[in-house]
Amino acid sequence: MAWRRIITKVSSHERELSSLRSLLVRAYSSFPRVGVTGAVGGGGASLPRTRFQSSYVGSFARRVRDREEVNEVAHLRELIRRNDPEAVIRMFESQPSLHANASALSEYIKALVKVDRLDQSELVRTLQRGIAGVAREEETFGGLGAFRNVGKPTKDGVLGTASAPIHTISTERTHFKEQLWSTIRTIGVGFLLISGIGALIEDRGIGKGLGLHEEVQPSMDSSTKFSDVKGVDEAKAELEEIVHYLRDPKRFTRLGGKLPKGVLLVGPPGTGKTMLARAIAGEAGVPFFSCSGSEFEEMFVGVGARRVRDLFSAAKKCSPCIIFIDEIDAIGGSRNPKDQQYMKMTLNQMLVELDGFKQNEGIIVVAATNFPESLDKALVRPGRFDRHIVVPNPDVEGRRQILESHMSKVLKAEDVDLMIIARGTPGFSGADLANLVNVAALKAAMDGSKDVTMSDLEFAKDRIMMGSERKSAVISDESRKLTAFHEGGHALVAIHTEGALPVHKATIVPRGMALGMVSQLPDKDETSISRKQMLARLDVCMGGRVAEELIFGESEVTSGASSDLEQATKLARAMVTKFGMSKEVGLVAHNYDDNGKSMSTETRLLIESEVKQLLEKAYNNAKTILTVYNKELHALANALLQHETLSGKQIKELLTDLNSPLLQKRQEVVTKQSNPVPPSTPSSASSAAAAAAAAAAAAAAAAATAATKGKDMAPVS
């Protein structure tokens, strides 16, 4: 038997036997003891109980127990010498106290070998399970995995020989800091490796993923001509020489002349800057590259500079050509040391490309921006964008031409007078006028009309300038009456004040955020505003508040005049601090919005005093006018309550029909303006209200007569 050979080998090698004993004891003692019947963990197995006694009693008990074990081991050896292995087996298995004794275990194994029952003994299976558990517990420290085959014969029938030794590995205990540092290094190396692979993949996939080479394609079919661009004749004249250069470059280069490399179009939004660039390409018949400043940057660093290089590289292959960059301030803003490096890279690449290609390559760079002051100085210097062309809002004639261009695409009625619409739309850009025509066409289509009429254009203009009507808003009669007198006060002061803008329309229909509105439009385009016009605007702003006080009393004034007071205060402060229209402050400009840093306390108080004086004077002027023309105020308010909306022409007809000596009243206004009336007290307001009530009947009768006489005074939608 294999176990018999093991015992023989162990007997000849006492040193190996001692190691095996310690191993077997550890493995065997970690499991329940073998009972008399050979069952593990049976009822016959019991562990020695540890009693917590004094140190003296404990040491005495241990000495007694050790002496008994020595005697029992000696008895087992005696039985072996007597050749009675069965008695040794019975004694060992019946006494659990011997299971932890190495000498007793050795005698027990000898007895099993003699009776040839070692392979069938419960001890073998218990040792195999115990050694496997110990090996799992000690694997971290080089454990006992080599002893998992205990009880199984090897090639030579023994656990190990000189030719087939049992290999064991012993490792030193590692410290926590070393283990942590090793983990961090592993994670760091992995992160760097993944980042490098990702960067390599992105770098190779940027061109395909973002489609740089596919996007840089010129537009060869630009059908826009200079004749399609209206209202910017001066800008077109400056761009014509670029067209001639693109058509015949040798005409300019033969004398050594050099055209600008870059043209910067500056102006408000919607004035036709992009259309001008397309017209250049259409007139010259050359390829046209179009892009936006925001298209260069992406989430990847360096993409902007690469796109700039690809754009100019494609342009060089198609020269002569035009590159148009819209909203160039997105990449051409002034550089700041705090900006990100990738933002500077794009601008630097743009600067190099603008000043890097040869002069005669036939590439014209046209850019557009609404904020030329925000561009970097290196970008707009001579040699790059060295020509600036201003594209302003069109004047009256330009607006008429633009309206004609857009109206040629819709069905127009015979009563349409585009010059009237052009005069009534100061400050409108080409895009605003195109929107006006489109809104009018949609209105005519909704109404089922065959063509676009003048009323449709007026509706579109009022909707853009005054906001959409809110006819469904529920407003009380008291609020409508107060709004009518408020707007009537504005209109009357504007009519009877020299220098005020003509009244275009008055309405008490809510539009936008306002309950009512008086619209004023100039007869012609204004390039500057005089002091008389500004003072007239202050008077008109005060007209609504004064009308409320005269009709309803100071205790009944509302918050409806808050916007008027805000506009008047801003205008009066600008007159004092910006326009030098105050004798006390002088011809000095002050920055009033810097919390007083640019002025002393005395100067600030002086400015406030001058502003208050201007507003009080405007208040007195408005009060004088409305007191004199109180009858007209009632008539106008009643007409607004009846028709809700009146045009400037209808208001003038209403006032003309009133039986009043206008020349005499104007003379009285001039006389009373020389002696301003102070702000009224509640008693004076009451008397004014009484006087107004006395004239109410006559005014109402006159308004009714005028409404009957002029049937054309229908509400203007």
Curated annotation (Swiss-Prot):
Transit peptide range per the UniProt entry: 1-53
Tagged with keyword Plastid: no
Predominant place of localization: mitochondrion
Cofactor binding notes: Binds 1 zinc ion per subunit.
Job description of the protein: Probable ATP-dependent zinc metallopeptidase. Involved in the assembly and/or stability of the complex V of the mitochondrial oxidative phosphorylation system.
Keyword Translocase: no
Transmembrane segments: 181-201
Active site per UniProt: E487
InterPro entries documented for this protein: AAA+_ATPase, AAA_lid_3, ATPase_AAA_core, ATPase_AAA_CS, FtsH, P-loop_NTPase, Peptidase_M41, Peptidase_M41-like
Family membership: In the N-terminal section; belongs to the AAA ATPase family.
Coiled-coil stretches: none
Subunit composition and interactions: Homooligomer. The complex formed by FTSH4 does not contain FTSH11.
Additional remark text: In contrast to fungi and metazoa, plant mitochondria have more than one i-AAA-like complexes.
Record's note on what induces expression: By high light.
Gene this protein is translated from: FTSH4
Membrane topology category: Single-pass membrane protein
Protein name: ATP-dependent zinc metalloprotease FTSH 4, mitochondrial
Any one GO molecular function term: ATP binding
